[in-house]
A protein has these predicted regions:
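C-terminal outer-membrane/trafficking sorting elements
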Residues: 3-5, 13, 25, 391-399, ...
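N-terminal cap/lid segment of alpha/beta-hydrolase-fold proteins
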Residues: 29-82
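Gly/Ser-rich "nucleophile elbow"/oxyanion-hole loop immediately N-terminal to the catalytic nucleophile
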Residues: 82, 139-167, 175-180
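Short beta-strand element of the alpha/beta-hydrolase
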Residues: 83-93
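Short amphipathic alpha-helix adjacent to the substrate-entry channel of hydrolases
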Residues: 100-122
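Catalytic nucleophile-loop/oxyanion-hole region of alpha/beta-hydrolase
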Residues: 102-104, 122-140
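The feature captures the conserved acid-bearing segment of alpha/beta-hydrolase catalytic domains
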Residues: 183-266
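C-terminal catalytic-base region of ester-bond hydrolases, centering on the histidine
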Residues: 242-385
Length: 465
């Protein structure tokens, strides 16, 4: 595959954005590793459009808590003559003032992918420190919608954030989708490997309502919401993602939680870590090797899911929906025709689905870090596996407990039961009984999640022996 990429270097020809041109022809720009081939056709493949990249700048603005000159990239199809759907991407929080060329290298893969398929992609780095992350994201996206309305269709929008950027994507989408109705003709949010919720720093008291359970519930129902976290990620505590996912107010049919799993094939390791989505940056914190190689996971986890959610949100494509929101459809869980281990896909995520949690090694950014503002507005933000036994609850009983293998287990509740979920001790959902009686064919410790019509739910352990 050869793409023609025309790069524009931005100066300040009007208040926020401007450009001068220099053409560059890049061929085979992505070194590829591993035994499984890249996707070259269908969902996840690069498109046929030639691509233009512009570097833009936005001046600091203390009103928006942005103390840095924002430097970013906007990419779009060559010859675009109408406003196109846009993907806004928010990077992790390295707080390194990268040169434009180095930041471009880290973002080129996904920027080019989106634009080659006929859409617009925009991203910008954070520069000096954490005081500017959310404010600068708010500022540059606002300026982009205002100054490039001839190119960017603010009614068709996706937000994708990685690590710290995942928290910004959660906050900014909730803010802009509600306050400005961005994405009203098709919208999605994809937080990856990330922080729970990053909003205003200085103005947090006036923004706190967005971070409450009811604030998260205000996400518009038509938003498509994908959350991805990674099996061996020792940076992001999965509880932060699970908490946000559980309270994010879109129907189950429009949201999905993924646990991305790695694999080893012919001695090549496909790492599923905090850095799975990177095709350039080096991981020097968790392993002694470069684990961010450009390989098949960048397509089956990365471009294929992104392609599918764009086509679902912006073109109402039913086949694409099965790939990104398939509720466990084989199109969603099968990678590379079964050659590569697929993800866990669930609406009821749990920490023990992650090897990083089961290993007991802890996290660089545990749920209890001071900047996880959710823990200040809800007591359940950093829940643990210290579950009570089912017998500790007064408003329902389960009997017999312990039960024998294949013995009928009955739930008797004072309140109408809406849903019953049963997990094994690894945190995997093993059944969803449709009536208040069921059997289990293996001994072990199990978790019962019982949800009532009143909106409350209880989790507790019981034994089959």
């Amino acid at each position: 595959m050869t793409l023609q990429l025309l790069c524009k270097k931005v100066l300040m020809s009007f208040p926020a954005l401007g450009a001068f041109l220099f053409p560059v022809l890049l061929s085979g720009q992505y070194a590829f590793d591993g035994p499984i081939s890249a996707i070259t056709s269908g969902y996840g493949s690069f498109g046929n459009d030639s691509v233009i990249h512009e570097f833009f700048t936005v001046n600091p603005d203390s009103l928006y808590e942005c103390d840095d000159t924002v430097r970013g990239i906007i990419s779009y199809p060559y010859g675009a003559n109408a406003a196109l759907p846009v993907l806004l991407s928010f990077p992790g929080g390295s707080y390194v003032d990268f040169s434009d060329s180095n930041y471009f290298k880290s973002q080129e893969f996904y920027q080019s992918f989106v634009a080659s398929n006929g859409y617009v992609a925009a991203t910008a780095q954070y520069n000096s420190g954490p005081g500017s992350d959310e404010g600068c994201a708010y500022l540059w996206t606002t300026e982009l919608m205002k100054n490039r309305s001839n190119l960017v269709d603010s009614t068709r929008m996706g937000m994708r954030g990685y690590s710290l950027g995942a928290g910004i994507a959660n906050w900014l989408s909730l803010t802009m989708f509600n306050d400005r109705n961005w994405g009203s003709n098709g919208r999605f949010v994809w937080p990856d490997a990330g922080a729970s919720f990053i909003g205003w720093h200085d103005d947090w008291p006036n923004d706190i309502y967005r971070q409450t359970d009811s604030g998260l519930a205000a996400m518009p129902d038509d938003v498509l919401y994908l959350m991805t976290m990674h099996d061996l990620d020792n940076t992001a505590d999965p509880r932060t993602g699970i908490d946000i996912y559980n309270f994010m107010g879109v129907p189950d049919s429009n949201k999905e939680f993924y646990v991305i799993k790695g694999d080893t094939i012919n001695n090549y390791i496909y790492w599923a870590t905090h850095f799975t989505q990177s095709t350039y940056a080096r991981d020097s914190t968790q392993f002694t090797t470069f684990i961010t190689k450009h390989d098949a996971l960048d397509y089956w986890f990365g471009t294929r899911m992104l392609h599918a959610v764009m086509e679902t949100a912006w073109n109402n494509d039913p086949l694409a929906r099965r790939i990104c929101l398939g509720n466990g459809d084989s199109l969603q869980t099968t990678y590379a025709n079964g050659q590569l281990r697929g993800p866990i896909v669930t609406d009821t995520p749990w920490m023990t689905m992650f090897e990083s949690w089961n290993s007991g090694g802890g996290y660089m950014n545990p749920c209890e870090v001071t900047w996880n503002m959710r823990q200040y507005v809800t007591a359940d933000a950093c829940f643990t596996l210290n579950l009570p036994e089912v017998d500790d609850y007064d408003d329902f009983t389960i009997y017999p407990n312990p039960a024998a293998v294949d013995q009928k287990i009955t739930i008797d509740a004072d309140i109408e039961v809406e849903r019953i979920l049963v997990y094994n001790e690894l945190g995997r959902l093993i059944m969803e009984p449709k009536i208040e009686a069921f059997t289990i064919d293996r001994p072990g410790l199990y978790v019962l999640d019982i949800q009532f019509e009143t909106g409350t739910n209880h989790r507790g352990t019981f034994i089959v022996q």
